[in-house]
């Protein structure tokens, strides 16, 4: 991938950009095999990759500069701002949005937040695009609601320029810390969720719900999990750390009982909406802590699917699963180091299948799907 920002030394986020994709995949596979070297693996499936540029469905832009000359991008460690509107990881459809947002910020009088001075209002612009219909969700992260009336007043102009903006919100993040969003979300549009579709499964994206940033590879990840589950004798499963329900909604069949658990209420609202659309009445999604939910249960289903954050599922949940011994565990991980650590805490299981998903090209990061079977 060619990147003018990298070539000019202005951005180093894609540290592996000079390596061809096959070399990147080889290095990631070697890393994964090294992490799982202590465990016999029955089958190594071929790694899955997608486009090497234009693949991201989300932009998280730090807003800096001035009202008249706004920069959207990032801050270097020394506080120097860098405009990343030309980042080749973003699809071409993002460019006109960034171009319209800069004059809109001036029209609405949204002073960019100055980290050094702790002054200003507009901290971040968060943009998400649906692959299914091209609709977009735009979130303005503000320090306070002081400029809210001005923003609302200027909004018709933005809608006129960008009719693809289906969901627009203001998020209030009042603290002087590098935190992307606060708890308060104010909707400026009637529509509150962005419609997405992977493999004919309807998914919904709401402002404060996690959603994969590489749709091409994520859809293959979900489809693979579905194919693995269909090969197993499973009538009842848990989907822990389920997010908007991507895994569970793909894996469920009309006669299967499934419980999806996720701590974020916004994500659970999305999952419930999808299940209703699919007419799957035996799916139950609850906004709870996954570990607390699981360890409080006196029995387990045949299959437990886990998709934890980078920290992994942790020892308490590993101990519970070891004791309760579901027949199958499918572990989807964005951090193979913590996954390997967790598998060490599940001594009664063998690894039947492993597959790497290159969700983050040009970096050392990757996702991995692992099927564990009770010995």
Curated annotation (Swiss-Prot):
InterPro entries: 23SrRNA_MeTrfase_RlmC, MeTrfase_TrmA_AS, MeTrfase_TrmA_CS, SAM-dependent_MTases_sf, U5_MeTrfase_fam
CDD domains reported in the protein's UniProt record: AdoMet_MTases
Residue numbers binding S-adenosyl-L-methionine: 212, 241, 262, 307
Reactions it catalyzes: uridine(747) in 23S rRNA + S-adenosyl-L-methionine = 5-methyluridine(747) in 23S rRNA + S-adenosyl-L-homocysteine + H(+)
Its EC number(s): 2.1.1.189
Residues noted as binding [4Fe-4S] cluster in the record, renumbered to the chain: 3, 11, 14, 87
GO function terms (MF aspect): 4 iron, 4 sulfur cluster binding; iron ion binding; rRNA (uridine-C5-)-methyltransferase activity
SUPFAM superfamilies per the UniProt record, alphabetical: S-adenosyl-L-methionine-dependent methyltransferases
Domain of life: Bacteria
Active site: 334 (nucleophile)
GO BP field: rRNA base methylation
Listed Pfam families: tRNA_U5-meth_tr (PF05958)
Enzyme superclass (EC): transferase
Keywords recorded for this protein, A-Z: 4Fe-4S, Iron, Iron-sulfur, Metal-binding, Methyltransferase, rRNA processing, S-adenosyl-L-methionine, Transferase
UniProt function note: Catalyzes the formation of 5-methyl-uridine at position 747 (m5U747) in 23S rRNA.
HAMAP family hit by this protein: 23SrRNA_methyltr_RlmC (MF_01012)
Family classification: Belongs to the class I-like SAM-binding methyltransferase superfamily. RNA M5U methyltransferase family. RlmC subfamily.
Name the record gives this protein: 23S rRNA (uracil(747)-C(5))-methyltransferase RlmC
Taxonomic path: Bacteria, Pseudomonadati, Pseudomonadota, Gammaproteobacteria, Enterobacterales
């Amino acid at each position: 991938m060619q990147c003018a920002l990298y070539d000019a030394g202005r951005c180093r986020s894609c540290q592996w950009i000079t390596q061809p994709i096959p070399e990147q995949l080889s290095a990631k596979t070697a890393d994964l095999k090294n992490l799982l070297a202590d465990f016999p693996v029955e089958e190594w499936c071929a790694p899955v990759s997608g486009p090497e540029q234009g693949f991201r469905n989300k932009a998280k832009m730090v807003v800096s500069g001035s009202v008249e000359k706004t920069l959207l991008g990032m801050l270097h460690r020394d506080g120097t701002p860098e405009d990343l509107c030309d980042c080749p990881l973003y699809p071409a459809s993002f460019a006109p949005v960034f171009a319209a947002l800069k004059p809109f910020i001036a029209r609405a009088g949204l002073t960019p937040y100055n980290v050094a001075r702790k002054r200003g209002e507009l901290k971040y612009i968060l943009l998400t695009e649906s692959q299914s219909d091209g609709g977009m969700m735009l979130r303005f992260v503000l320090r306070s609601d002081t400029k809210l009336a001005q923003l609302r007043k200027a909004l018709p102009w933005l809608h006129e320029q960008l009719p693809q903006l289906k969901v627009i919100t203001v998020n209030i993040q009042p603290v002087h810390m590098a935190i992307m969003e606060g708890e308060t979300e104010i909707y400026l549009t009637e529509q509150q969720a962005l419609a997405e579709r992977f493999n004919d499964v309807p998914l919904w994206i709401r402002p404060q719900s996690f959603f994969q940033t590489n749709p091409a590879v994520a859809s293959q990840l979900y489809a693979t999990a579905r194919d693995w589950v269909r090969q197993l004798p499973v009538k009842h499963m848990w989907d822990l750390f389920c997010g908007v329900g991507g895994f569970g909604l793909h894996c469920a069949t009309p006669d299967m009982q499934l419980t999806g658990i996720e701590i974020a209420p916004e994500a659970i609202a999305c999952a419930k909406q999808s299940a209703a659309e699919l007419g799957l009445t035996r799916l139950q999604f609850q906004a709870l802590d996954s570990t607390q939910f699981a360890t409080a249960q006196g029995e387990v289903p045949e299959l437990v699917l886990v998709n934890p954050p980078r920290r992994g599922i942790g020892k308490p949940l590993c101990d519970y699963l070891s004791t309760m011994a579901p027949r199958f565990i499918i572990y989807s991980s964005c951090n193979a180091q913590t996954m390997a650590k967790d598998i060490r805490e599940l001594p009664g299981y063998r690894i039947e299948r492993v597959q790497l998903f290159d969700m983050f090209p040009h970096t050392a990061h990757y996702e991995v799907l692992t099927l564990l079977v009770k010995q």
